[in-house]
A protein has these predicted regions:
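Cytosolic regulatory regions built on CNB/CRP/Popeye-like sensor folds
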Residues: 1-170
Length: 170
């Protein structure tokens, strides 16, 4: 893992696309608020196979994927892949509980890591409405993740039923 300084070149490059197409957690933030929020995070670089988050470890931070591709693994089972713009571990703001899955870099990857303490300090210095927007964005992100999980469960249930029917016909 290579960490870059707060004003590293990677940070400047990553901000432009974020400002033009904000990730779900930053939607309805002003451009100034987005820039201020991004300044709270630390840039970290990973290469293929690096573990970004480990299942079971303390979840006192979240990551914004600014470059690359990561895979999510639970009990050695591939759950999904996430691309640039994805937030990982966004529930850290409510409760720094244990990580529920491994997050692995599938290629050269860059994240902005936000600690719970620094993020809460950031929102304490801002108008309360910004924190409320952030919380609504977390709820929206969670809803999208739940909908995606529902779809995956439905597909797996269909495959299971087809497999059972195939076994019964033999």
């Amino acid at each position: 893992v290579e960490q870059l300084g707060k004003n590293g070149q990677m940070r400047i490059e990553s901000e432009e696309w974020i400002l033009q197409d904000p990730p779900v957690l930053l939607q309805n933030f002003s451009e100034e608020d987005i820039r201020d929020f991004l300044a709270v995070g630390d840039v970290e670089k990973f290469t293929l196979g690096d573990l970004i988050m480990r299942e079971g470890e303390s979840g006192n931070s979240a990551c914004l994927l600014t470059k690359g591709l990561v895979s999510i693994w639970k009990n050695n089972i591939h759950i999904t892949n996430l691309e640039r713009g994805s937030f990982i571990g966004e529930m850290f703001i409510f409760n720094p509980s244990k990580r529920i899955a491994n997050v692995v870099a599938e290629e050269d990857t860059v994240v902005l890591r936000f600690t719970r303490k620094r993020t809460l300090d950031f929102f304490r210095k801002k108008p309360e409405r910004l924190f409320k927007i952030f919380i609504i964005n977390i709820v929206n992100l969670q809803q999208k993740k739940i909908a995606a999980m529902d779809e995956k469960i439905s597909q797996l249930q269909q495959k299971l039923l087809q497999a059972e029917q195939g076994t019964q016909q033999r």
